[in-house]
Each structure stands twice: as C-alpha cells, then as structure tokens.
Amino acid sequence: MTAQLHMMSDKHDQDNDASVLLQTRPRTKRPPLYKVLLLNDDYTPMEFVVHVLERFFGMNHAQAFEIMLTVHKKGVAVVGVFSHEIAETKVSLVMDFARRHQHPLQCTMEKED
C-alpha cells in the first residue's frame, strides 16, 4: 500500500500542533498470466497447425511456420501468454476447430511462473 502524508494545521489550534492525516490507497495486483501450449501429434497436418496459429493467434505465415516446427521437433511450444479468460477461450476455440476438422490437435494452458 502506498501512503500519502498530509500536514494539516488548525487556525484555532492554540499550541501550533499539526495534525497528521494518513491516506492509504490499495495497490491493485496484476492478474496471473497463462501460457497457451500446442502439443504435437502424429496425425494433424503441419499446414493445419500453421493455419490455426495464423487464425487464432494472429501470427504471420513465417511466425506460424516457425512455431509449428518447434511443436513438431520438441513436442510442445508456447503459442501465447494471456489472462486466464483469454487463454481459456483460445484453448477452447482451437480444440473445437481441430475437432470440427477431425484432427487430434491438442491445446492446453498452464499458469506462467
């Protein structure tokens, strides 16, 4: 909490004592952030993963291709860091989109350290 100190004097204060007024303002805490992760599988086409990254995470083709290769080689990649609600929505959108296109692509989220 931050505090501001204000000195106040009273005209009628015979002893010239100063009154102290302490105002506190609560410091708001930033909400926790969550990493959205894309997981590799042996069946989802690479082109589909690139399309998902462009469509749901606003990446250009080169960025999406680079992340897709990371997912392919390492098995997982962070595709973005968001507030809880946004991360949850992105995971849901990606999973629904993959399911509609009959791909087993997995997308998860975890709290950022």
Curated annotation (Swiss-Prot):
Disulfide bonds: none
Family matches, as Pfam families: ClpS
UniProt xrefs under SUPFAM superfamilies: ClpS-like (SSF54736)
Gene3D superfamilies: 3.30.1390.10
Region span, Disordered: 1-24
Biological process according to GO: protein catabolic process; proteolysis
Purpose: Involved in the modulation of the specificity of the ClpAP-mediated ATP-dependent protein degradation.
Binding partners and assembly: Binds to the N-terminal domain of the chaperone ClpA.
Family membership: Belongs to the ClpS family.
Protein's name according to its UniProt entry: ATP-dependent Clp protease adapter protein ClpS
Taxon lineage: Bacteria, Pseudomonadati, Pseudomonadota, Alphaproteobacteria, Rhodobacterales
